């Protein structure tokens, strides 16, 4: 169907909303948003990070393609590392913009990263779903899942949360 320039301008400006817009929650790769959401859930349940024996990260195949670093040399690489981000979150690190400007990986983050493995599990109904399974030294198993990251069209911010996000961005905060 051909459209004239006049027809294109008829409803110009009526609705500037972008359909299915995602709002980025964290100051690192958006491909890690779901795994970060799950890690923050687990941090609430974890009493002592020293009790962690093993952590398994489950992704849909290729859903982690942008998360190219499994081991990092410096925090700037950690922006693209599921292992780094999960370790830092579980250790209670503040992952703001300044964190990723550090020259070296903090030893406790690097140590915890060695206990983390990525696995792949096809989830045809939701390719964004991620799961973290954490085994503790006492035999307990903790698990958290994120079906859709906060800020996605399926789990959108409220108006108040959007205003807070804007205020943080203006103040250069994470």
Q: Which sequence ranges carry the predicted segments?
A:
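Terminal-appendage/accessory-domain detector
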Residues: 1-174
């Amino acid at each position: 169907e051909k459209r004239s320039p006049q027809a294109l301008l008829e409803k110009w400006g009526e609705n500037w909303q972008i359909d299915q817009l995602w709002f980025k929650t964290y100051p690192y790769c958006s491909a890690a948003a779901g795994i970060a959401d799950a890690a923050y859930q687990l941090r609430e349940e974890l009493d002592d990070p020293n009790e962690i024996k093993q952590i398994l990260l489950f992704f849909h195949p290729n859903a982690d393609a942008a998360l190219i670093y499994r081991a990092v040399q410096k925090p700037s690489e950690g922006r693209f590392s599921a292992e780094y981000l999960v370790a830092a979150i579980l250790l209670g690190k503040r992952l703001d913009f300044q964190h990723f400007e550090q020259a070296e990986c903090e030893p406790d983050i690097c140590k915890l990263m060695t206990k983390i493995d990525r696995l792949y599990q096809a989830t045809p109904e939701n390719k964004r779903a991620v799961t973290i399974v954490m085994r503790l030294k006492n035999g307990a198993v903790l698990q958290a899942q994120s079906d859709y990251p906060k800020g996605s069209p399926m789990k959108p911010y409220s108006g108040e949360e959007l205003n807070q996000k804007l205020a943080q961005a203006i103040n250069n905060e994470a």
